């Protein structure tokens, strides 16, 4: 992440392209795409939120709460590179969670052993996408607003109060 916080920085296009591809698309974009695509593949009679069971996601919630404290602290200290890095860590956490849960293996038969935990993780992935829309808003305002709408949220993301705290509960 190249930002002039404490000193000048050198900008070059190859580094910019590599960072966009390696960080934004590979971590953030991939995670959001996976959650939205897998959620869309569910039967219409079974919405994603019906699988929510946070008891399966305590480890992820703990990690996300820690990242939230770090993101908030970084933003309060005007350490934007650091805050962005922690936000990207939340996207990586989501990717790892989905990779381990393999919810795509249960989409055709939601009664299989292990499907309840796996689908609970996918449902938590939706919460995490909502959290990413909120925390990435200072860095990607237009994309965050688009994601906010794709998640079915009403109103303008910028004027949503305490939205990040709501995601963690």
What does each of the following model-derived ranges do?
Residues 11-24, 66-85:
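Extended, non-catalytic structural segments that build the interaction scaffolds
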Residues 73, 77-79, 88-161:
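Basic, alpha-helical terminal appendages of large translation-related enzymes
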Residues 1, 8-12, 85-86, 140-142, ...:
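Short coil/turn segments at secondary-structure boundaries
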Residues 32-71, 91, 95-115:
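Conserved, charged catalytic cores of large soluble enzymes
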Residues 2, 67-69, 130-132:
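Short hydrophobic "helix-edge" motifs at membrane interfaces and signal-peptide entry regions
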Residues 20, 24-27, 31, 56, ...:
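Amphipathic alpha-helix face/heptad-repeat signature
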Residues 1-53, 154-158:
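Catalytic adenosine-cofactor/nucleotide-binding cores of aminoacyl-tRNA synthetases and other
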Residues 159-169:
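Single conserved hydrophobic/aromatic residue that forms the stacking wall/gate
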């Amino acid at each position: 992440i190249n930002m002039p916080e404490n000193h000048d920085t050198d900008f070059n296009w190859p580094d910019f392209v590599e960072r966009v591809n390696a960080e934004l698309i590979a971590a953030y974009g991939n995670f959001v795409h996976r959650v939205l695509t897998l959620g869309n593949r569910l039967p219409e009679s079974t919405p994603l939120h019906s699988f929510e069971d946070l008891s399966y996601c305590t480890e992820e919630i703990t990690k996300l709460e820690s990242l939230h404290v770090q993101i908030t602290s970084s933003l309060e200290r005007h350490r934007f590179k650091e805050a962005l890095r922690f936000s990207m860590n939340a996207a990586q956490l989501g990717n790892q969670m989905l990779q381990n849960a393999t919810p795509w293996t249960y989409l055709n038969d939601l009664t299989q052993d292990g499907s309840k935990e796996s689908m609970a993780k996918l449902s938590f992935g939706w919460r995490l996408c909502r959290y990413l829309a909120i925390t990435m808003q200072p860095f990607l305002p237009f994309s965050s607003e688009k994601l906010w709408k794709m998640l079915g949220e009403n109103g303008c993301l910028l004027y949503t109060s305490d939205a990040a705290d709501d995601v963690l509960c």
